[in-house]
């Protein structure tokens, strides 16, 4: 008789399923989100446990020397131009997930899973998604070995991090970095436009993580104060935004309320040619910037994504008294942070990024390790304390447009 050497905590899995059901009930009561996220996810606790267990073991596999990353979507079998529907169903198993996942390493490609009349799970096809796709199904995103995001109704609910299971809560992370992004200007409407800065910064962090070489990004406000923290001369200095010459600006969004947000998406703006083109160009820009962080040294850019230099070496500012104390937190439910020291942040890349963020209070530093761990560094204006957000890859909005809707909705409700 075979026994699993590892089982995910059943109470955790049951709690995730209960939260999915609670979200479905909330959507039914809330007409705004019911209209956007109309999909009705029906998966039993046992099916969910089997799905997560199989995805977990597949995430540990190496295929021809490469680590496998893939995503699963639980949805009914259907025929569509963007879906390759298999003639014959294949029982859900880790081996086939590894085979298919090795060819679909993209945040816009999914392996489709359904349940038969007897409740058994099967692989039934492959789905290709556009950047404007609303992720309303149950979606499992494998970020690396043992690192799994659980997303439903367009919102990240929970995650597995190696041998830990957590509920994801990015609110503390967002509250820490958005004041720096929204710092210039006080007009509420303009601040909403600055939300664009926020999610493009997360896309760049995704791109940094994807190249798997490790990298450092320094995001700085206007002016040249940051130069005191950089060793001169800088090997690759200049300035550009890395946008296409024929860049099409995204339409201005006069979003006064959550209802305006609903109307914007319901009227099909996401599918308009100019919107799609502009969004694609911005994502290409983010990928180009993220890729350059693979060059040894740091990339410095403005909050509007104008690149000042890359391959830069960080130094301690002469006027800085230095710091040894930090507060470390993760985007997890109930994590309010803990006291730590510089020495436990990681290697030289993390230490230098932390020092830069401490010396430049209006800046944000981002580090992606070769293993795919992402950390954000920023100095809190209220206390002067250096805040480090570790495991930030859990909050990089891999859910795409759906995540933007959720977070923008919450932002509009606060203003």
Regions found by a protein language model. Give the residues of each.
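Divalent-cation
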Residues: 1-415
